[in-house]
Amino acid sequence: MRIAMHLPLLLLYIFLLPLSGANNTDAAHEVIATNTNNWAVLVSTSRFWFNYRHMANVLSMYRTVKRLGIPDSQIILMLSDDVACNSRNLFPGSVFNNKDHAIDLYGDSVEVDYRGYEVTVENFIRLLTDRWTEDHPKSKRLLTDENSNIFIYMTGHGGDDFLKFQDAEEIASEDIADAFQQMYEKKRYNEIFFMIDTCQANTMYSKFYSPNILAVGSSEMDESSYSHHSDVEIGVAVIDRFTYYCLDFLEQIDKNSTLTLQDLFDSFTFEKIHSHVGVRTDLFDRNPSEVLITDFFANVQNVIPDDSKPLSVSHYHHYKDHIDTAQYELNNNVLDLALETYRKNNQSSKIEKKIKDIKSTSVLDVDIDSNECFFTSFKQSATIILALIVTILWFMLRGNTAKATYDLYTN
């Protein structure tokens, strides 16, 4: 008899149990990321005052990834660093990417890892492949692993299948391709997003052959990449067109943005860039329309790697932020109604406590920043409502039975 009396409570508890984040394994698998850390390698390969725009290009990207949460410990910045304190700089100690001088790119705790003559082809290849001596500082190493997404941005002067370094040497597209293959063999990345802004930029990714690499370049073979505008006070161009319009798009991005890399690619037009932007996707497992910009430009926090689902942590935050709040309210109202029903029928305080315990462990009160992520569905809501109906019907039946029993003993 006691079991029958508490049967509805047991049913209600069983139906609500899947709403607990700790037990909703299906939902958790859908949002666990394949990458646990994001890195950025930002390289300006030129030097001298008249290449001011290249330093502004790379510092602009540096500012963007820092704004979106990637820490300096996961950013490798390589640049000549000969502009801010150049004697021709009318604004000593400052670098601007726009003639309105709205943002000082050099004034926000810039940490340069490789400067001046340290920016060499050898150091760049060693950085990617991690071929250093034991005494090389960790702060100047790319300490990635098989769960790392890496954004690599390069700017400077280039040609057909080559990019000049410091106007003294060149790196070929085959060199970068082979370095990426070594990274793949050594399990140094999960995915790579390669972006290059230079003349004939698209030729620099033509030799890539390693998996999980997405590449974009500012110009086709035999095309130049152009500067956007000059500053009459500084006396030179302050940013390139491709990077300018990249930044124009990225300024609307925050850490929770749902915009994708395809959205970024679609924003490039010949009228804006004055050259044909190229995108290479054949080595990449995902469609760019499924790759959030924050998968590469923002930081990753509180994730567990899982090879079974190729979803990034950005998808995780995206889904969490867009869970239907009305669904939460419905579940909450159902539990409140069930509790009120128990109270009206003079049930014990233990039963009331049990319902409160269910609420405290359900989706309604979960910490939105926890590692557990789950989704409530209409099917689950229907199950809760069904359990409530069964409970109410049982109380109605029990009430009639109790009255009949009372009449039997009193008459």
From Swiss-Prot:
The organism of origin for this protein: Saccharomyces cerevisiae (strain ATCC 204508 / S288c) (Baker's yeast)
EC numbers listed for it are 3.-.-.-
Share the record's PTM remark. The disulfide bond between GPI8 and GPI16 is important for normal enzyme activity.
The name on file for this protein is GPI-anchor transamidase
Q: Which GO terms describe its molecular function?
A: GPI-anchor transamidase activity
Q: Which gene encodes it?
A: GPI8
Keyword Protease on this protein? Answer: yes
Q: Note on file?
A: Present with 1560 molecules/cell in log phase SD medium.
Q: Does the keyword Disulfide bond apply?
A: yes
